[in-house]
């Protein structure tokens, strides 16, 4: 996949109508936005376009309205809060059809530097099917398309791919540019030693990632629920821990492949365990084996040190997926230890979206990382080496 895409700085935007696909899929509680990270992430691109005299038309999805208008998934609260953050009024166009009379009228009245926000693109069922009609309607509003929603770049939808069939100038905003720079460089030309830390519950979610990264990394670190499948494959006792029986052969294969390629394949050497899946006091095991009647819920202290040492010597570190059940206070220690090791390291540190990003932000290490990806599924597919349709649709 070509990572050298044209950006908003490569084109003339003054006086032009610019449709910007943002990621405003934010959590709402009683109409109030509870996490503003995605709004703040969109500001640099919007500010640049406003300051350079573009007519800025913003669009995004929120939640899963499944092609029907749902008032609780309206983008009205986003328009209100974004206006405050931008320090400039953003006109909201409340059309259930997204590109309706309100939107057309609002766009027709725009002056240079004005901003309009369209309604939730998933109010239209064609959006997720990349339907021609809705793509044309969106494209009819603008002369330039900017994609700045990395979180949906792995989806071929009307507002990410379809519009580019009808608008010739299609470029990326600052957010996607940053994702391509850090994730792209990490995957294509990483500074070595390159360490990948993979956690989370399931091996099956990370198969393609492990496959792709084994050709690039010096060390792979495995934590979270998926570690128990690898340990069982090597003949260790795992008690009642999570295991994917149908992935045991695959786990053996990966360990053999790592050995063949000279990649360090690190698995937990001790665990924090409990008798049931609850936030109860943890027992630390002596070694890799987990006693009968207990389940592993986090890596243990010896493993924390082993993993932290690997991170300390690295020049590039990518992390995707927690080391344990970090929602439980007794079992968040491994995740904290890895986050801290990355925060203290001099390496380029990249967090691959999703749960790891949430964990790092909750733990207060966010500003110590080089880059926190804004896309969970998108960054995973990127690490799998897949082409992301929302990015390949943009001008080289």
Curated annotation (Swiss-Prot):
The keyword Metal-binding does not apply. One of its GO terms (molecular function) is ADP binding. Keywords: ATP-binding, Cytoplasm, Glycolysis, Kinase, Nucleotide-binding, Transferase. The keyword Cell inner membrane does not apply. It is found in: Cytoplasm. It catalyses: (2R)-3-phosphoglycerate + ATP = (2R)-3-phospho-glyceroyl phosphate + ADP. Pathway: Carbohydrate degradation; glycolysis; pyruvate from D-glyceraldehyde 3-phosphate: step 2/5. Its main location: cytoplasm. This is Phosphoglycerate kinase. It comes from Clostridium botulinum (strain Alaska E43 / Type E3). The lineage of its organism: Bacteria, Bacillati, Bacillota, Clostridia, Eubacteriales. The gene is pgk.
